[in-house]
């Protein structure tokens, strides 16, 4: 029997039927339990007033995560003049760049303000909540990490993220991979080391430490230099709080931040949204799970051949 076996097909069908039944009753089955973060987690305080736009952090991230070489070198400052779409949208992260620096020119400022963007590693991640296969994990260190072996490519996380950070790799339609900053978890964070971008910064724009301590440092800076900072720490409370937090010398809305977010975690809004589309929820997971199984079997066959003993045994059972 070629393609997906009947056993796998029936399994997918049963999963789809179960999802349909559950989705018509409640949305709780598709949401992870409420997660309030870890009190002793690590974080990063970003002081935008110190950034000079050198892009060293972009280069360090590229090396640490073994990402493709960029089309323009990291020394090329012309990227700051690039905009996308008719609304003048700045550069954003994608599957080839987990962090980007953009330049802003807020009113009343003598010099530009540079802002580094990456996943903010929410205390209560909406990407985790929206993922029905639990491909996301919030670690005790504070990182929100992703398991590509579990992901089925539904892209719910991209819709749910309030910061629009998860990026999708479109290189293969049947091999779903979401790309984003992982806080250098595998190579640095879990070993107690700061992320590569923090380590490389020549201006000490970023401070790595326990989140609670960083909040104290931030408010001390604001109190000591009220003329230098806006009296707000972005990320302390927004959407339930984030591991990456920001100080700014100009209004946050003028340097690319969404200031319309409230302090309620997106997790509750995700549940409300999922509750409005039960039939979509019923079809979407089963559809993408089926695609994922087809793709992985195809790759396995290409690697081992259709006569591989495992395939023959599976077909006998089906």
Predicted regions and their residues:
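Short, conserved phosphate-binding/catalytic loop or strand-edge motifs used
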Residues: 175-179
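Iron-sulfur cluster-binding cysteine motifs and their immediate structural context
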Residues: 29-34, 56-75, 98-102, 124-152, ...
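C-terminal segment of N-terminal export signals and the immediately downstream linker at the start
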Residues: 24-60, 295-318
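Aromatic- and Gly/Pro-rich amphipathic surface segment
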Residues: 80-106
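Long, compositionally biased charged/polar accessory segments in the mid-to-C-terminal portions
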Residues: 207-305
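N-terminal secretory signal peptides and thylakoid transit peptides that target proteins
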Residues: 1-17
């Amino acid at each position: 029997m070629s393609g997906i076996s009947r056993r796998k097909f029936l399994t997918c069908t049963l999963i789809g039927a179960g999802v349909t039944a559950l989705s018509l009753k409640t949305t709780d089955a598709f949401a992870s339990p409420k997660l309030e973060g870890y009190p002793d987690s690590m974080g990063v305080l970003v002081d935008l007033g110190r950034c000079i736009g050198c892009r060293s952090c972009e280069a360090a991230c590229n090396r640490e995560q073994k990402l493709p070489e960029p089309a323009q070198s990291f020394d090329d400052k012309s990227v700051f003049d690039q905009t996308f779409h008719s609304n003048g949208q700045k550069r954003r992260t994608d599957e080839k760049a987990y962090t980007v620096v953009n330049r802003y020119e807020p009113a009343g400022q003598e010099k530009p303000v540079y802002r580094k963007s990456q996943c903010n590693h929410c205390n209560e991640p909406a990407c985790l909540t929206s993922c029905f296969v639990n491909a996301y994990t919030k670690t005790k260190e504070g990182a929100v990490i992703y398991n590509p072996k579990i992901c089925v490519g539904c892209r719910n996380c991209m819709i749910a993220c309030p910061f629009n950070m998860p990026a999708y790799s479109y290189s293969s339609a049947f091999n779903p991979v979401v790309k984003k900053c992982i806080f250098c978890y595998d190579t640095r964070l879990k070993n107690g080391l700061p992320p590569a971008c923090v380590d490389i910064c020549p201006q000490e724009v970023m401070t790595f430490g326990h989140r609670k301590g960083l909040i104290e440092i931030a408010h001390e800076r604001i109190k000591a230099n009220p003329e230098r900072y806006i009296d707000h720490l972005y990320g302390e409370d927004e959407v339930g709080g984030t591991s990456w937090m920001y100080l700014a010398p100009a209004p946050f809305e003028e340097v690319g931040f969404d200031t319309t977010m409230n302090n309620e975690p997106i997790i509750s809004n995700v549940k409300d949204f999922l509750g409005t589309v039960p039939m979509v929820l019923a079809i979407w997971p089963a559809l993408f799970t089926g695609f994922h199984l087809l793709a992985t079997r195809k790759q396995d066959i290409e690697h081992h051949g259709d006569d591989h003993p495992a395939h023959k045994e599976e077909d006998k059972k089906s």
